[in-house]
Amino acid sequence: AELEAAGKVKAVVTQNIDGLHQLAGSKRVLELHGSVHRNYCRNCGKGFDAEYVRDYPGKVPLCDACGGTIKPDVVLYEEGLDQQTLEDPVFYISHADLLIIGGTSLAVYPAAGLIDYYRGNKLVLINKSTTPMDARADLLIQAGLGDVFGQIEV
């Protein structure tokens, strides 16, 4: 968030669904797999916040408008991403001067394929274990993402 506020980071692209980037203060967070903080009725599409779902008295939260089942706005296994979800990440990645990828094995597609849109020559990979893209990195840091970002001074 501090790097974004300083104009050093244009966007955060994440597969995480927990909303922690926003909690840390990041403003432009592109959530590939959605967020558990947004929920919607599978029948009528009405939106609900996490508190409604958490405080719902029954086991399965139901829509107060139509009685339909409420689902978190997240991509579940075997569900694909729609093209619109990928448009902004592709834009920011393809226009980046520096691309930092961290905390991912680069094994989950289509998210892992977004690296192919990067046209720059400053690719930084930060991950505890090896990834299929390690050889492409200009800087490879084999460490925990939290440890690395904890040492950055803005």
Region locations from a protein language model:
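Conserved catalytic alpha/beta core of Sir2/sirtuin-type deacylases, generalized to analogous enzyme cores
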Residues: 1-154
